[in-house]
Amino acid sequence: MVEQSDTMKGTTTVGIVFETGVVLASEKRATMGYLISNKTAKKIYQIAPRIGLTTAGGVGDAQQLARLMTVEANLYEIRRGKRISVQAASTLLSNILHGNRMFPFYVQLLIGGVDETGPVLFSVDAVGGTGKEDGIVATGSGSPMAYGVLEDRYTLGMDERSAIELAIRALRSAIKRDAGSGEGVAVVVITEDSYHELSDEEISVLTPN
């Protein structure tokens, strides 16, 4: 049995469903025990044209899963002639993780995007347990601090800018109190029309006071 504390170290990631899309966000710190091993760690991966994956946990496990999911999403589109849906991608990811439950990937993941059903967001644990998130979700060691902000400020059907600002605010709260989180934030916005990773300049403009 994998304890939750074993899969939630050294990261904070956030997912928010807004009116027309999904915001995925993370901070950039990677740690090895008490050492800050990387200050520009990538924790959000594009696995399909309108689907993103956030990762918390072991870096090697997360990178391997991101590569595998990208390949599987491409194969799905080639074989079926249509893009994989967010739910199908979460089910595939769940099956991969559950199939390795005796030798688990030490990760906690969010998978979100926009498909024919609209904006969709799922959380996935280390042994394949999935849950559809209706509005907000956070993972990693800083998630308790992030949830405090998300629960207080999230409103159903909020607009894109408000969702981005909320994600940044939640991550900043986690960074202030969680030693495993830090070094700035990364933000991805997924809508029906685009998958867009915000630049540092865009983030600085949208960062709430």
Curated annotation (Swiss-Prot):
Coiled-coil regions in this chain? none
> Mind listing the GO molecular function terms for this protein?
threonine-type endopeptidase activity
Q: Which residues form the propeptide?
A: 1-10
What's the catalysed reaction? Cleavage of peptide bonds with very broad specificity
The EC category is: hydrolase
User: CDD domains from the entry?
Assistant: proteasome_beta_archeal
Task: Return the PROSITE patterns for the record.
Answer: PROTEASOME_BETA_1, PROTEASOME_BETA_2
Question: How is the activity of this protein regulated?
Answer: The formation of the proteasomal ATPase PAN-20S proteasome complex, via the docking of the C-termini of PAN into the intersubunit pockets in the alpha-rings, triggers opening of the gate for substrate entry. Interconversion between the open-gate and close-gate conformations leads to a dynamic regulation of the 20S proteasome proteolysis activity.
What is the annotated localization of this protein?
Cytoplasm
Q: What quaternary structure, including any partners, is listed in this protein's UniProt entry?
A: The 20S proteasome core is composed of 14 alpha and 14 beta subunits that assemble into four stacked heptameric rings, resulting in a barrel-shaped structure. The two inner rings, each composed of seven catalytic beta subunits, are sandwiched by two outer rings, each composed of seven alpha subunits. The catalytic chamber with the active sites is on the inside of the barrel. Has a gated structure, the ends of the cylinder being occluded by the N-termini of the alpha-subunits. Is capped at one or both ends by the proteasome regulatory ATPase, PAN.
What's the protein called, per UniProt? Proteasome subunit beta
GO BP of this protein: proteasomal protein catabolic process
- Similarity comment text for this entry: Belongs to the peptidase T1B family.
Q: Give the matching HAMAP family.
A: Proteasome_B_A (MF_02113_A)
**What are the TM regions of this chain, as residue ranges?**
none
What lineage does UniProt assign to this protein's organism? Archaea, Methanobacteriati, Methanobacteriota, Stenosarchaea group, Methanomicrobia
Which residues of this protein are catalytic? T11 (nucleophile)
